[in-house]
Amino acid sequence: MNLEKINELTAQDMAGVNATILEQLNSDVQLINQLGYYIISGGGKRIRPMIAVLAARAVGYQGNAHVTIAALIEFIHTATLLHDDVVDESDMRRGKATANAAFGNAASVLVGAFIYTRAFQMMTSLGSLKVLEVMSEAVNVIAEGEVLQLMNVNDPDITEENYMRVIYSKTARLFEAAAQCSGILAGCTPEQEKGLQDYGRYLGTAFQLIDDLLDYSADGEHLGKNVGDDLNEGKPTLPLLHAMRHGTPEQSAMIRTAIEQGNGRHLLEPVLEAMTTCGSLEWTRQRAEEEADKAISALQILPDTPWREALIGLAHIAVQRDR
C-alpha cells in the first residue's frame, strides 16, 4: 500500500490526532503556545502516531482512545526533538530554523519539559496502568539512549552493538511503544501484542538506519536540514563506521580524525568518496531493509485487513524514502 492510500485510510483518525495535539498543546503561558505551535506545525512525517492509529485498527479496535495514544506519542517525539536540537546545537530542522535558534535554548528546554508532562497527563486519562508502565519505561529508555549517544560523540572505537543499542533506545523504543500501547488499549491477544511490539522495534531501527544514511546521501534542501551534520558533530553512525573499517588506511585515518575532532564538514567530500568506494551507504540501506523485512514478518500474527496492509506499506516506505 502506498502513502497516498495509507493517508486516505487514516484520514479521519489522523484529523482527530492533529486536533487533539492542538487542543492539548494549549496553555495559559503565551511562550508555550508560540514555541509549541512553531515546532508542531513544522511539517513532520507523523509516522509514529500513524503507527499507533494503524496498530489499534489492525486488531479490531472501534473506539477513539487510540487517538489520544497517537497524539501523546507525537508529543514525546516532539519533546525529544526540542531537547536534541539544544544538545546538538542544531539550527535547522524540516527546512526552517530550529526552535532553539528561533526562541533560545532555555525556552526550548522548558517547553520540551511541558510537552513531556502533558503527554503523561494524557496517559493517565486513558485509565490503563499497563499503557502507563510501557510508556514511562519507554521514555526512560529514550533518555538513556540520548545520554549514550552523547557519550559516543567523538569516539571512533564504538562497536556496532553499541551503535545499535543507541538507535534502539533513542528511536526504535518509541515506535515499539506506539504499536504496543495501541494493541494493549484494543485488548489484543498477548501474541498480537508481541507482534506489534516487534513490528515497532524493527521498523524504528530501519527508520533510524535510513536517517543516518540520508545524512550523507540526501540533498540538504530536500532533507530539511544540513547534510553532514552527523559528521560535523563527531557522531559515529553506521555508514561512517563502515567506511572507516573498510576504507584504505588513509581514508580510515581521515574518518577517525573527523570523528575524534568534530567540525568535519569540510571533509564531507572525501568521506563520501570513501563511502562510495566501500559501498557503505548501500550496506546501510541493506541493513535497514533487513530490519523492515523483520517488521513485516512480525505482522503475520494479525488478521489480513487493510490496516495490516498499511502497516506493511509503512515498512516499505520507511526504507525507500529520501528525506
Describe the role of every protein-language-model region:
Residues 1-323:
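All-alpha prenyltransferase/terpene-synthase fold signal
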